[in-house]
Amino acid sequence: MLLLIPSNHISIKETSSLMVVTPSSRTLFVVIVSFQQRALTSSVPVFLAVKRGR
């Protein structure tokens, strides 16, 4: 399952916290670190790629 979540620089923090607090799937692959820094520099909506494996 591949989820694309459009989020702002503020939403990224909320999303990252939720992902860390909610380990529902066996494998959770989240790409935030690189996008976080970019989002902080520019207030452009960033797409978070969340790969969940059943």
Swiss-Prot record:
Q: Where in the cell is it found?
A: Cell inner membrane
> What does induction of this protein depend on?
By heat shock (shift from 30 to 45 degrees Celsius) (at protein level).
The primary location reported for this protein is membrane
State the Gene Ontology BP annotations: cellular response to heat
Q: Which domain of life is it from?
A: Bacteria
Report the transmembrane regions from the record. Answer: 28-50
The keyword Transport is assigned to this record: no
The UniProt entry's GO CC annotations, sorted and at most eight, read: membrane; plasma membrane
* Database matches in InterPro entries: GndA_dom
Query: Which keywords are on file for this protein?
Result: Cell inner membrane, Cell membrane, Membrane, Stress response, Transmembrane, Transmembrane helix
Q: What topology in the membrane does the UniProt record assign?
A: Single-pass membrane protein
Miscellaneous information on this protein: Entirely encoded within the coding gene for gnd (AC P00350), on the same strand within another reading frame. This protein is produced independently of gnd.
Name of the protein in its database record: Protein GndA
